[in-house]
Amino acid sequence: MLDKSEAIIEAIDAREILDSRGRPTVEAEVRLESGAVGLAQVPSGASTGSFEAHELRDGDKARYGGNGVLKAVRNAKEKIAPELIGKDALDQTTVDYAMIARDGSDNKSNLGANAILAVSLAAAKAAAAELALPLYRYLGGPLANVLPVPLMNVINGGAHAANNVDFQEFMIVPVGASSFKEALRWGAEVFTALSKVLDSKGLLTGVGDEGGFAPNLGSNEEALEILVDSIKAAGYEPGTQVALALDIAASEFYADGQYTYDGTAHSPAEFIDYLTAMVEKYPIVSIEDGLHEDDWDSWTILTARIGHRVQLVGDDLFVTNKVRLQQGIEKKAGNAVLIKLNQIGTLTETLETIDLATRNGYQSVISHRSGETEDTTIADLAVATRAGQIKTGSLCRSERVAKYNRLLRIEDELGDRAVYAPKVGLGPQF
């Protein structure tokens, strides 16, 4: 039997590092008395929901334009560390709720969600190291064997790119693959074909924050047409083999009760009609943030209209928060929740939200942020929770590919036990 004293937290360190956009973020290191160590880095978003946990920045314009995180680093070292040293890293719930209590706010604004999450994840990794288990197995147990279907963001728009495309993400989804390895290959081949299609049209092939191409296009629908052409050019069947998904990020272009896209303002009813028409015209299996984060009535209408035929994901709507998700469940708003660790700020609360979703028939989509690091926790989390879906960007930029490569390693480790999510009814099943 494990000697619990060997999992006692002995020291916590933290530092300011850079994310994939060159902005500071927090890295934390948790060391146990046994010598086991966990290291974690936290991401940062560009398009953020109003109800997210607070990311603490320094505000000192003389350093990183005010985006430094030295305050959060200090909080981890001077306020969180004394609270956790001596506690059992194997008791994740106690570790996380001790930090929540020490912070004392509703949104982690005192210590900073970036400080709290970094320590939360580092503690979990230290505990996994103590037991000599991979993180996915430590978190998920023996049933952690489902590899997620990737929703690959190959055309970037909105807040993720400096172009004229309103919608934030246009994704390909290899639903017909037989394994994660095959799904990744299909995605990479479509991505290469997309590059050639864009080049043939004289469009730029520079990439946005998440590694997708960021061309200036005539309309949002043109992006969908180009993706369908690219899937065919790669030798795959649109819909049955490689489907499409969208992150509308509608809160970004909503004001005064209207949605403004393609240069024209539309009422919520008109926008719902537009989304319905797109689902009928294109092989779309998932739409994220199709409406504003507080437009609950429209969300209910949209879900009743097309929720039986397409996955409707709440990101800004739910912000990985079980209270917001419970509201959505009661209002029948959406049928899936995007899971971003830094929206809520601890591993425990993230797992609680996933559990609530599962118990109420909502799908969970594990997600990165636009400002990422080399940390691959979300890959392990997707497998641990049997979520069946992951969003971690395009097929380029090493901070994105790191997560895909981690999933390849997990699939290899699992061997014959590995199952690709669509094969067991997980992922967007439409």
Swiss-Prot record:
GO terms for biological process: glycolytic process. Keywords: Cytoplasm, Glycolysis, Lyase, Magnesium, Metal-binding, Secreted. Binds a second Mg(2+) ion via substrate during catalysis. Mg(2+) binds at D247, E288, D315. PROSITE patterns: ENOLASE. Gene3D superfamilies: Enolase-like C-terminal domain, Enolase-like, N-terminal domain. InterPro entries: Enolase, Enolase-like_C_sf, Enolase-like_N, Enolase_C, Enolase_CS, Enolase_N. It catalyses: (2R)-2-phosphoglycerate = phosphoenolpyruvate + H2O. One of its GO terms (cellular component) is phosphopyruvate hydratase complex. The active site is at E210, K340. NCBIfam families: eno. Catalyzes the reversible conversion of 2-phosphoglycerate (2-PG) into phosphoenolpyruvate (PEP). It is essential for the degradation of carbohydrates via glycolysis. Belongs to the enolase family. This is Enolase. It comes from Picosynechococcus sp. (strain ATCC 27264 / PCC 7002 / PR-6) (Agmenellum quadruplicatum).
